């Protein structure tokens, strides 16, 4: 067994027991990354920096100064600013941008002893559900349907993070989730991903898409690994005005905790048209597993669910059009010349932004314009409030909610890329938690008939990641999901 096959927890235990060093563990991952370049998961490899960080980690351990993630090699979604290391958001406009500061989330991981392997691919500015909008090309899912060589999407926007974890190219990865960008890729790649409560992780140093929806979180191999990473990533940050000043528990203590007596809500509105029978069956399996673990199953209603997707695709582009106004070619990033200032702006943005980003800027600018603001944007905000109220009402009946993560297994690269609506429908089960600011976790619970992974989602009350991890631990144990992508790369 290669060192790269280890879970994060097993690797940390092995390092603590002196079975191997961080340099050895890191080198094994660097070799795996080099062999897997065809997947395009990493858009920037930092092997020298990784070995340097690993050597320093081994030195700290020798002095008895090991942090909670000491010596563990991780991947970083290229939306997190990394001091002195190129950060692009996978756009042409930031192709050569090198930040002079470190995002809060990554600096906390390095503080706890983790090692950086490189920067991971994503949909441009985190806008997309298939990783096909990246300026650096799509990521290929390490999973393939049985008997097929067809390239599949790893999901998006955190496709690089999910593919790298699934292919054992890191022990865990940072990711972000604005409408499902952690959970849908996790479901497509047989990995675990959690979007915590809005404000649990600092957004400082994370390239902004939609500021009221964006939230950082980890993608990992197991529920326990995700809990380990989230514990390090969370915490109050005065540099982010939306960061919550509340204590962070050690989330790992809740994994494996009994769920006996918990009430699990099953929302009837999540039974959508054309949902594959396999996903419905998996949902029923999840219900049965939790019943066996001692949970009480409660039918609940989230009546405004059907408006969530349209509301999301008004609110998110509106915020994006505002956030992306800063890319003007003046202070940083790409600059295309022109005869006057307006022309420089136009040329820079026309050349620097990809089609999907332009589409969302146009939608956002339209819904914020005079005459349409009330009809679209204000209405979407009212719907958002109603969705949050639906959840508030549900919490009087249940402690957590169980749903599928995505309406399908991974689809082929290029299959939906010319149909934005079909692409947006990928988020049908995930956007509600972003609109309401709730924690949501996806974990792999089974394979479809083609041997592709399917995920279940657990949604929790605000700031109750503890219960989410307990329920996820129970589902993980019952599902016994150990399948890995067969290595073809």
From Swiss-Prot:
Keywords: ATP-binding, Ligase, Nucleotide-binding, Protein biosynthesis. It comes from Caulobacter vibrioides (strain NA1000 / CB15N). Allows the formation of correctly charged Gln-tRNA(Gln) through the transamidation of misacylated Glu-tRNA(Gln) in organisms which lack glutaminyl-tRNA synthetase. The reaction takes place in the presence of glutamine and ATP through an activated gamma-phospho-Glu-tRNA(Gln). One of its GO terms (molecular function) is glutaminyl-tRNA synthase (glutamine-hydrolyzing) activity. The gene is gatA. HAMAP family: GatA. This is Glutamyl-tRNA(Gln) amidotransferase subunit A. GO terms for biological process: translation. The active site is at 77 (charge relay system), 157 (charge relay system), 181 (acyl-ester intermediate). The keyword Nucleotide-binding applies. Belongs to the amidase family. GatA subfamily. It is an enzyme of class 6 (ligase). Gene3D superfamilies: Amidase signature (AS) domain (3.90.1300.10). GO terms for cellular component: glutamyl-tRNA(Gln) amidotransferase complex. Its EC number is 6.3.5.7. It catalyses: L-glutamyl-tRNA(Gln) + L-glutamine + ATP + H2O = L-glutaminyl-tRNA(Gln) + L-glutamate + ADP + phosphate + H(+). Heterotrimer of A, B and C subunits.
